[in-house]
């Protein structure tokens, strides 16, 4: 884990954060459906999904977004998540 201390003013428009990669699996899709209640057939029904333009099940947006956020967890900005914590 890398710790940084970066303030709002330090971020530049267009800056990027490079992370490692991760494959979204069938298990990810099914588990996310169970956690979120998103059981639409194009996510969980393999036979139905074959009839779609994708030809297979597709991950929920919220699943891909969650995984994307998790990939950034290797860089921790102490200012971003503990600001004001000392006053609690």
Give the ranges of each region predicted by the language model.
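Hot-dog-fold acyl-thioester-processing enzymes
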Residues: 1-85
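Hydrophobic/aromatic beta-strand elements that line small-molecule binding cavities or substrate pockets
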Residues: 88
């Amino acid at each position: 884990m890398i710790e940084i201390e970066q303030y709002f003013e330090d971020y530049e428009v267009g800056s990027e954060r490079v992370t490692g990669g991760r494959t979204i699996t069938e298990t990810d899709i099914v588990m996310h459906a169970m956690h979120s209640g998103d059981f639409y057939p194009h996510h969980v029904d393999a036979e139905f999904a074959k009839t779609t333009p994708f030809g297979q099940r597709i991950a929920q947006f919220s699943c891909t977004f969650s995984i994307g956020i998790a990939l950034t967890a290797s860089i921790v900005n102490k200012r971003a998540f503990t600001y004001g914590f000392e006053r609690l």
